Every structure is written in C-alpha cells, then in structure tokens.
Amino acid sequence: MVNTQAREDLHIRLEETQLLDRDCTTLSRHVLQQLHFSPDAQDISSLMNRIGLAGKLIARRLTRAGLLEDTLGFTGTVNVQGESVKKMDIYANDVFISVFKQSGLVCRLASEEMEKPYYIPENCPIGRYTLLYDPLDGSSNLDTNLNVGSIFSVRQQEGNDENGLAQDLLQNGHKQIAAGYILYGPSTMLVYSIGQGVHAFTLDPSLGEFILVNENIKIPEHGPVYSVNEGNFWQWDDSMRDYIRYVHRHEGYTARYGGALVGDFHRILYQGGVFLYPGTVKKPEGKLRLLYESAPMGYLVEQAGGRASTGTEEILDVVADQLHQRTPLIIGSKEDVALVESFIKEQKRISNQG
C-alpha cells in the first residue's frame, strides 16, 4: 500500500515537473534546445525572438484597432501587387523593419508590401540573413474584427548582392532555414519550424512571452475540412469545379473559409484537410505570393508531414523568377492534396485526348 502511494506521488511530481518545464519553455529557449551545439543557434534564436517581438507589437495594436485613429481603413494607395493598402498593412510592415534594423542579424528585408527589398543602412550592424514576410495576411478581415496573421521566412544571403537585385532569393523553397506564422485571434500564437518539426507557442500577456503549447505537430493524413473561396467557382477550370462537386456529393466534408491564409491553414494543420487557392482561367498563376506566403507555408506543412503543391509541382521545388511571383496553392493533408491533384491530372488527360 505504501509502495503504491509512493509511486502515485512520484508520478504526480513527474507530471508537475513536466508541466512546469513546458510552462517555462519560451520561444528563444526552445530554439536553442532545437539547435543544440549549432554555431547558428544564438543567431537563429535571436531572429525568432525579434520576430516574436514584431508579433507582440502588432498584436497590441490590433487589440486597440477600433479605439485608435489611423488604424482601420485604407491609405488610399496601392502596393506593388496592385492591391489597395490598409493602414495596418503599413504599420505592420514598418514594425518588422524597425525591429530588425538595428539587430545586426539581417542584411535585407523583403515584403509583399515593398517593390524592392529594404537594405539595412551602412551605419547599422549588418547580418547575413534575409527576412521575407507578409506583414499582415488577410488584412481585408480587419474592419470586421476577424482573424489576420503574419507569415515569415528566413534565408541566408548567398553572394554579396552588389547590384541590389536580390537574385540569390530567386531559389526554391528548400533554401529556407526557418519559416512560420503569427496568428492574431482570440489568443496570439506563433508557429515555426527550423527544419526539426513544427511547434506552436501562445503569447502569455502576463509574462510578455511566447510559451510552448504544442510540440512536434503532425497534420492528419486526411481531414474533413476543405478551405476555398467558392465565390470563384465559375472562374476556375473544369478540374477545380469537378473537385468541388465531388466534395459536395460525398459525406464527411465540411467547408471552412475565413479569408486569411494563416487562419485557414492553422485549422487544417490541427484538424487535417486541404486549403486551396487555385489559379483561374484568366489568371492561371494564382494570387498568393511564392516567397512570402506559399513557400513558408509549404515548408511548415512538409515538416508536419503534409504536402504543398501547385497542382502539378511541389511548392518547395518551384524556383522563383521574380520577387513577387505568384503561384497556385494546394496545401494540407497528404491524402487530400493528392485527391485535388487527381482531378487536375484527369482534366489534363481529357484535354490531351481532345
């Protein structure tokens, strides 16, 4: 009886210790644990800390968005993508620049909001990494207080980029050394990978720290969710329309689409399924940016055991030919991505026969 009680007490103490260890695992500590004795450990940990700081600043601004002037609404300008720019787009973009400008960690920042990369001034410490980012994904959701996010990717500079064209960034997604996103929702979460699994952290407002909540996340092989803007149905080719008709006819599927890649992908990462943003007949290249959105998410999903595809090619195999290149995106559980691809292959077979 005594031995049984002692074992139970020991088990309780072990559980409490494990919970305490988890509660004490901050983002920077976790990165250092992941990299162990790597010579890059301190730099990558500092990089992630800075990204986390940018996320905290943006999250704080978003929580007061309706109370502050010059926060919601449009600026009246368009970005390099030809899209109307929200005031929070500019704020979020400037936050990342401010956070990294004096860090000594990066040499450039490339954003979907800027036509050309921002080069760290010569009077500031200059690092060897490049941060590519979408400062505020889903900003059309802002005025209705729905989920938005930030997406990031880290690459190492190759060469000296003397001509300022950043051609070394025009490589495939396997060249990324870190990627992730920050989700601004009921809580603020940061999800990242440095090539050793996918890990999720929640911002504890009382501590001001991102605390580990899920380690080594694995996406289910198949899931019930399909996430796509069906308002574009008649703009797609037959393969996409056939896929949508298939999930409408078969039980076990549920549609979820929130208008922000980060929020929609986050659900699929945990529940399984597929997110689609295919090209249209008029714009087969799609809408999402390869370097700032598709490749970082592709890196994450592969680390979690899923897949990301253009429909004909793995996202991480795509070599960019320009900084703001767009690409179709099919991302999620392996079985669900393969199902979408099967409709694309069938349509090509029919077209070739014709």
UniProtKB/Swiss-Prot annotation:
One of its GO terms (biological process) is gluconeogenesis. One of its GO terms (molecular function) is fructose 1,6-bisphosphate 1-phosphatase activity. InterPro entries: FBPase_C_dom, FBPase_class-1, FBPase_N, FBPtase, Fructose_bisphosphatase_AS. It is an enzyme of class 3 (hydrolase). GO terms for cellular component: cytosol. Pathway: Carbohydrate biosynthesis; Calvin cycle. Keywords: Calvin cycle, Carbohydrate metabolism, Cytoplasm, Hydrolase, Magnesium, Metal-binding. Mg(2+) 1 binds at E112, D134, L136. Binds 2 magnesium ions per subunit. Its EC number is 3.1.3.11. Mg(2+) 2 binds at D134, D137, E293. It is found in: Cytoplasm. Substrate binds at D137, G138, S139, S140, N229, Y257, K287. Its cofactor is Mg(2+). The keyword Transport does not apply. Its main location: cytoplasm. It catalyses: beta-D-fructose 1,6-bisphosphate + H2O = beta-D-fructose 6-phosphate + phosphate. Homotetramer. Belongs to the FBPase class 1 family. NCBIfam families: PRK09293.1-1 (NF006778). This is Fructose-1,6-bisphosphatase class 1. It comes from Trichodesmium erythraeum (strain IMS101). The gene is fbp.
